[in-house]
A protein has these predicted regions:
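Extended substrate/RNA-proximal surfaces in nucleic-acid metabolism proteins
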Residues: 51-218
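Mid-to-C-terminal alpha-helical segments outside catalytic/metal-binding sites
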Residues: 267, 276, 281-292
Length: 292
């Protein structure tokens, strides 16, 4: 069993790198990749760790980069990157706009937009969060959920889960909650170039979760046809069998590599388990043999 999409406390996960390795060993995972958001700092910790004493599988160096595409934010995965080089490239890009400052800005903007919708929130100064690691949108959503009165003021899919709130509404230019982040993140081309410069392979993750996309297959093909993509995440925690089958067939047709991952975040997405997602995710090891 493998899991190539995992987050730790180096970004927005709740497991430390060591805790993650212990869980991976308990689950008998054969391959893992720590793909923290916009950083490879977790791999710095691994350099100081006797990995063989904790985890007997193999680790593929990875990263997940948020980038802008068509005035929206999407993510790409980088595998087999030089982690030192990747960290250097990310530092250089964000040198004048730290993650902490960006999240503080988004928090203030989103908080005010929610008030315009006449939604109830805790006083801004009383909301406890850490902009160095936490996402402003998740923090706001979690606070909105504390007040049942908000349910009658929010569309059902906005209230139901964070993915709907974030990817359908906060990412929708036609909705009051929209925040244009396109200037704050690298473009898709820039993000791809950084991964390539760090010697890595570029994969497209969770392609069916972008709820603002009206035609997912058209969206996927546009990126595949116009950008130097190496592979696609074909197995993901929320994919249907039909979606996985479509992506596998696309990879075969376009001669792209395949991968899969749970998008594990620990307690921040407590229903998603390492290796198995919602419990039924089974990623065959043989899909990665041609590129590892």
């Amino acid at each position: 069993m493998i899991d190539l999409h995992i987050h730790t406390t180096c970004s927005d996960g709740t497991d430390t790198v060591l805790e993650l390795l212990k869980k991976a060993e308990e689950k008998k995972l054969e391959y893992i990749s720590i793909t923290d958001h916009d950083t490879c700092k977790g791999y710095d910790q691994l350099k100081e760790t006797k990995i063989d004493d904790i985890f007997h599988g193999k680790i593929i160096p990875g990263i997940e980069i948020k980038c802008s595409y068509l005035k929206r934010t999407i993510e790409i995965l980088g595998y087999k990157v030089d982690t030192d080089k990747m960290n250097e490239l990310m530092r250089n890009f964000y040198k004048d706009k730290s993650r902490e400052n960006l999240q503080k800005k988004y928090f203030d903007l989103l908080y005010d937009k929610c008030l315009k919708m006449e939604l109830t929130l805790t006083k801004k100064e009383e909301i406890i969060w850490n902009p160095k690691n936490d996402w402003a949108s998740f923090t706001i959503y979690s606070d909105l959920k504390k007040y049942e009165s908000n349910q009658t003021k929010m569309p059902a899919d906005m209230w139901a889960d964070f993915s709907g709130f974030n990817r359908k509404y906060c990412a929708n230019p036609n909705h009051v909650l929209y925040i244009d982040k396109s200037e704050d993140y690298p473009s898709l081309s820039e993000a791809i170039n950084m991964i390539k410069e760090a010697g890595g392979l570029v994969f497209l993750p969770h392609l069916f979760i972008y709820k603002w996309v009206e035609n997912p297959k058209e969206f996927i093909n546009e990126i595949v046809e116009n950008y130097p993509i190496d592979g696609i995440e074909c197995y993901y925690n929320s994919f249907t069998e039909e979606q996985t089958k479509y992506l596998i067939e696309l990879c075969n047709k376009k001669k792209l590599y395949k991968s899969g991952g749970s998008d594990y975040h620990g307690l921040n997405k407590e229903k998603i388990q390492l290796g198995t997602g919602y419990g039924d995710l089974k990623i065959p090891e043989d899909i990665i043999q041609e590129w590892i």
